[in-house]
Amino acid sequence: MANNKSAKKRILITKRNNLQNRFYKSSVRTLTKRFLSDLETYKISQSNTDKDKLQNGLSSIYSLIDKGYKKNVYHKNTAARKKSKLAALLKAA
């Protein structure tokens, strides 16, 4: 266990950051899975409502990825790669 004040503080900060990192990564994974299932539905139906749903889903994923990058959960290139892959999937649909 930590013996001095700064080490104890670092333990608390590490726990806080770990929770924050898990929240962002889990949320991005969940929204991505939802986006991919909506994408499959759109490929079958080709309706405008599904297209709007995809656009909204993509923007919310982008927002979370950008916030995660801003809080050092994701590296800049990792965030860009995730966003680029999702955009390419939507464009191909």
Swiss-Prot record:
Domain of life: Eukaryota
Transmembrane segments: none
Gene Ontology CC: chloroplast; small ribosomal subunit
Compartment annotation: Plastid, Chloroplast
One term of GO molecular function: structural constituent of ribosome
HAMAP family in the record: Ribosomal_bS20 (MF_00500)
InterPro entries linked to this entry: Ribosomal_bS20, Ribosomal_bS20_sf
Organism: Thalassiosira pseudonana
Principal location class: plastid
UniProt entry keywords in alphabetical sequence: Chloroplast, Plastid, Ribonucleoprotein, Ribosomal protein, RNA-binding, rRNA-binding
Function: Binds directly to 16S ribosomal RNA.
Protein name: Small ribosomal subunit protein bS20c
Protein family (similarity comment): Belongs to the bacterial ribosomal protein bS20 family.
Alphabetical list of Pfam families matching this protein: Ribosomal_S20p
One GO process term, biological-process aspect: translation
